[in-house]
Amino acid sequence: MLLELALWLGQDIRGFNVFGYITLRTVLAALTALAISLTAGPGVIRWLAAKKIGQAVRDDGPKSHLTKAGTPTMGGALILIAIGITILLWGDLRNAYVWVTLLVTLGFGAVGWVDDWRKVVHRDPKGLASRWKYFWTSAIALGASIFLGLSATTPAETELIVPFFKAVAYPLGVYGFIALTYFVINGTSHAVNLTDGLDGLAIMPTVMVAGALAIFAYVAGHAGFSKYLGVPYIAGAGELAVFCGAICGAGLGFLWFNAYPAEVFMGDVGALALGAALGTIAVVVRQEIVLFIMGGLFVAETLSVMVQVLYFKASGGKRIFRMAPLHHHYELSGWKETQVVVRFWIITLMLVLFGLSTLKLR
């Protein structure tokens, strides 16, 4: 809304056209979302506490987690509020990519909200039945995939880009693109959700990956930079840099309250939504493989659960890890919670920098 107002004023008043620059609006989006999170955070936490929306803790996990019982959860709603308001203020609402990403984010957040609400408020340990949880997330992801696939106007928008190799891309076709997009959005969403198990563990890697995707989005949406760096030019994709800025700002604001010892937890409402947002943005800017690299922590956490379950069933009750997801394994191996979190942050930072290097190493 502010963008449209600024551009309208810019027709008669010199200086307002500066708000048309994506770089400026990305910074403003980050600052706005950060301010909203920091300002609204205490009130949201008090409301959650008053409604007794507290975290339930498994008694078979690390004993140190027992002290977390009752900590307000569903704080991811704060992140979504900050992102939503920020995008309405600074995003280009004429851009289809902005709307697709926003609707996917809010849609996955709604599924997470219902799941959390049933678990915490209705005291249903299963929450939203798994089949319905995956049905609704799949429906949203598939809807976005079909829209993006059918609205593609150039071959570059549906090609799989291979990093580190110049001009190496595999045409997926509409159906291949839809299938890949579905798995990226849904997979990233649930991977981030599995990672969200320790104070600050999931949100900071999400911020790091979003920050890197902002750079990829800006490059992909800029005809000159995309040609110079050998990245597919996707008209309009640059606006997603503003969305990434909002994720970074909202995420850092949430981390203020989620850092150890956490005053609030994100819950499925935040984790599912943020993962879906990252997946959608990566698909639009054609960096699915790079997302796999930068989000290596999310991948490792997911694989640890899959391997643990498969091995447990195949071996008749034996386990590879002390506990899955992976962060619990290290906790039970003697690492303190803060050590696990910070070390996983460091690993993510290295992976993100490695992913960014693909812009030049071709």
UniProtKB/Swiss-Prot annotation:
Its cofactor is Mg(2+). It is found in: Cell inner membrane. One of its GO terms (molecular function) is UDP-N-acetylmuramoyl-L-alanyl-D-glutamyl-meso-2,6-diaminopimelyl-D-alanyl-D-alanine:undecaprenyl-phosphate transferase activity. CDD domains: GT_MraY (cd06852). The keyword Transmembrane applies. InterPro entries: Glycosyl_transferase_4 (IPR000715), PNAcMuramoyl-5peptid_Trfase (IPR003524), PNAcMuramoyl-5peptid_Trfase_CS (IPR018480). It comes from Azoarcus sp. (strain BH72). It is a multi-pass membrane protein. Catalyzes the initial step of the lipid cycle reactions in the biosynthesis of the cell wall peptidoglycan: transfers peptidoglycan precursor phospho-MurNAc-pentapeptide from UDP-MurNAc-pentapeptide onto the lipid carrier undecaprenyl phosphate, yielding undecaprenyl-pyrophosphoryl-MurNAc-pentapeptide, known as lipid I. Belongs to the glycosyltransferase 4 family. MraY subfamily. This is Phospho-N-acetylmuramoyl-pentapeptide-transferase. GO terms for biological process: cell division; cell wall organization; peptidoglycan biosynthetic process; regulation of cell shape. It catalyses: UDP-N-acetyl-alpha-D-muramoyl-L-alanyl-gamma-D-glutamyl-meso-2,6-diaminopimeloyl-D-alanyl-D-alanine + di-trans,octa-cis-undecaprenyl phosphate = di-trans,octa-cis-undecaprenyl diphospho-N-acetyl-alpha-D-muramoyl-L-alanyl-D-glutamyl-meso-2,6-diaminopimeloyl-D-alanyl-D-alanine + UMP.
